[in-house]
């Protein structure tokens, strides 16, 4: 399988004495679709911020053979690492095709951007097909449905040949059909890329995650398949407030002697 994996060792992020990420280790392999879950404040977004250079961190973060910590954000992006946020950042006045053109660095100037063209670069055409937006390529991005804007933003990463995608709650606010389509999209693009998803939607996670890391208080609490994580008593305690307990044994009738 082609692609590069993400390796994190003893990652720590501290803000004014508060440790938001506390000694995290992760191994995320190419072809994985890894979900990061956990309560609010568990350190999920801060971890991704550290990987992408938005916050200072100690430890080790490697993508393939490349060290990431200490590099500026723009250099990390040039290494094939991209992320999305909960609110899609697209150019709403421009068409879907123009958004992808800009992201791909296709070299079209502002005036030529305004003209339609017959030939579409291969990476742009492939991104349109992969995201299911081919029939909407001439629509302004601002009129797209919420889910379609998220797909466009993912497409803008694909045309840049991003190899590690870090997606922050990509299905927040989506309809059921949009969530299903997004899950299918993530499964397609993760076959030869490394994809990490921060998510709170447990139904979405159960349907599409290939593996799961549960964070709590800045640490990795549990890791494995969906079934393994769901069966972990420590995870149940964090989410339910108590560890799962076996059903109580049925009461055994006790004979009570009648008083004389």
Task: Name each model-derived stretch.
Residues 2-260:
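Glycine-rich phosphate-binding loops of nucleotide-dependent enzymes
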């Amino acid at each position: 399988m082609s692609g590069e994996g993400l390796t994190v060792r003893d990652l720590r992020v501290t803000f004014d004495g508060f440790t938001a990420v506390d000694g995290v280790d992760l191994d995320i392999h190419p072809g994985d679709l890894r979900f990061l879950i956990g309560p609010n404040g568990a350190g999920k977004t801060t971890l991704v911020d550290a990987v992408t250079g938005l916050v200072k961190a100690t430890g080790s973060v490697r993508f393939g053979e490349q060290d990431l910590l200490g590099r500026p954000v723009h250099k990390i992006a040039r290494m094939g690492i991209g992320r999305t946020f909960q609110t899609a950042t697209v150019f709403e006045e421009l068409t879907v095709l123009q958004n992808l053109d800009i992201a791909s660095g296709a070299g079209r100037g502002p005036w030529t951007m305004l003209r339609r063209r017959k030939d579409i670069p291969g990476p742009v055409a492939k991104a349109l097909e992969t995201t299911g937006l081919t029939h909407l390529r001439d629509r302004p991005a601002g009129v797209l449905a919420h889910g379609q804007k998220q797909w466009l933003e993912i497409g803008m990463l694909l045309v840049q040949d991003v190899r590690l995608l870090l997606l922050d709650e990509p299905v927040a606010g989506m309809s059921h059909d949009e969530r299903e389509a997004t899950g299918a999209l993530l499964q397609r693009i993760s076959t030869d890329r490394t994809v990490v998803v921060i998510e709170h939607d447990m139904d979405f996670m159960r349907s599409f995650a290939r593996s799961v890391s549960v964070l709590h208080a800045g640490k990795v609490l549990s890791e494995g398949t969906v079934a393994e994580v769901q069966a972990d008593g420590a995870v149940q305690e964090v989410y339910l407030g108590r560890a799962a307990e076996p059903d109580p044994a049925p009461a055994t009738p006790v004979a009570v002697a009648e008083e004389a």
